[in-house]
Regions:
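Short, small/polar-rich loop/turn modules that mediate ligand/substrate recognition or access, typified
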Residues: 167, 172, 225-227
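Catalytic Tyr-X3-Lys loop
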Residues: 92-111, 126, 130, 155, ...
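Conserved glycine-rich cofactor-binding loop
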Residues: 9-10
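Catalytic loop of short-chain dehydrogenase/reductase
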Residues: 83-84, 128-154, 159-168, 180
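C-terminal substrate-recognition "lid" of short-chain dehydrogenase/reductases
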Residues: 208-232, 237
């Protein structure tokens, strides 16, 4: 299968690319923004993979990629990329531009890429879309997460719309809701991590590799699995 992973050169995205690339039946395409060295190391490890440098904050860069994407036969799309940070200020201290910028850089590109992939999936009567969001959308998000959590909440509803509209075309759309992980994206200090561990049922943080395993599960699941959300949080937020 041809699988596209956005934001695939580092952190969770890299773990997903590595896990999916273990199967020789998969051709994994992934985007990266600035970390060419990391992208090259993945290509050395998995020669069948392909990397595309895309800046999701740049309309021209996205436009060029979407044009290239039209010629590719993407069977599975993993929407993972996020431009920016999760932690911010409280709502009353956050400039309105931070909300509009986050929407422009994270939601619009995702919609653009997803629309393009769906057009090909419709023709082939098959497709899987897996959206990486956050467990914060099913619980009260931490203080300062209003920008990040709001963009992810939009993607959550967008995914549900896709699952309904394209089920008859054998296209599924599901979400993975991971809890906090330690990656390049992480912003908590040692003290904050320690406090988090005190209340964690397993006394250990989630790893990117564990989340990647759930993505592989969704990839191999029946097309009956559609419109669902899988929280990965040790049962801390029961849906």
């Amino acid at each position: 299968m041809n699988i596209l992973v956005t934001g695939g050169s580092s952190g969770l995205g890299r773990a997903i690319v590595e896990k999916l690339s273990e199967s020789h039946e998969n051709v994994v395409l992934f985007t990266y923004c600035c970390n060419q060295e990391s992208a090259n190391s993945l290509l050395e490890k998995f020669p069948n993979d392909r990397a595309f440098q895309v800046d999701f904050c740049n309309e021209d860069s996205i436009g060029k990629f979407v044009k290239d994407l039209e010629a590719m036969q993407v069977d599975v799309l993993v929407n993972n990329a996020y431009a920016g940070t999760a932690q911010g200020a409280r709502v009353h201290q956050t400039d309105i531009s931070e909300y509009t910028t986050a929407f422009k850089n994270n939601v619009i590109p995702l919609i653009n890429v997803t629309q393009t992939c769906i057009k090909g999936m419709r023709k082939r009567k098959f497709g899987k879309i897996i959206n990486i969001i956050t467990s914060s959308v099913i619980d009260t998000p931490p203080i300062g997460y209003s920008v990040y959590a709001s963009t992810k909440a939009y993607i959550r509803q967008f995914s549900k719309s896709i699952s309904k509209e394209y089920a008859s075309f054998n296209i599924t759309s599901n979400c993975v809701l991971p809890d906090y992980m330690t990656t390049d994206f992480s912003i908590l200090d040692e003290y904050q991590l320690g406090k988090m561990m005190e209340t964690h049922p397993l006394k250990k943080l989630l790893t990117p590799e564990e989340v990647a395993s759930i993505v592989v599960y969704m990839l191999n699941a029946s097309q009956q699995l559609n419109g669902v959300e899988i929280p990965i949080n040790a049962g801390q937020h029961i849906v």
